[in-house]
Regions:
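N-terminal acidic leader/helix
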Residues: 1-35
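Short intrinsically disordered terminal tails
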Residues: 1, 71-94
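Residue-identity detector for glycine
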Residues: 17, 50, 60, 82-83, ...
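Amphipathic alpha-helical packing elements
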Residues: 25-71
Length: 94
């Protein structure tokens, strides 16, 4: 199943070597204005679920890095436009 229909990607965890793609993961662009709030909600849910403290802390540091990045670039309202619409909503071209 294509979880992320907007992006094709291959990501490798440099510590454990696990590989992730658009089949089992998703991408949030750091420039998107909604990302800090989305990460804060994720962090809160991780706390509720009992994730280990290091994971909670790493999310907090990620939120700070995203905010710092956004302060140095033109952050934008996220969008899905043009040909992305048919792919993201209807799964065309998968």
């Amino acid at each position: 199943m294509n979880i992320d229909r907007k992006f094709k990607f291959l990501a490798v965890n440099p510590v454990n070597g696990h590989i992730y793609t658009d089949e089992d993961a998703l991408v949030l662009c750091a420039k998107d204005k909604a990302v800090p709030v989305a990460l804060e909600a994720y962090q809160k849910e991780c706390v509720r679920l009992g994730a280990n403290p290091e994971h909670i802390e790493s999310i907090g540091k990620l939120i700070q890095r995203v905010k710092e990045y956004q302060s140095s670039v033109k952050s934008e309202v996220p969008d899905t436009v043009g040909g992305e619409i048919a792919r993201c909503i209807n799964g065309e071209g998968l």
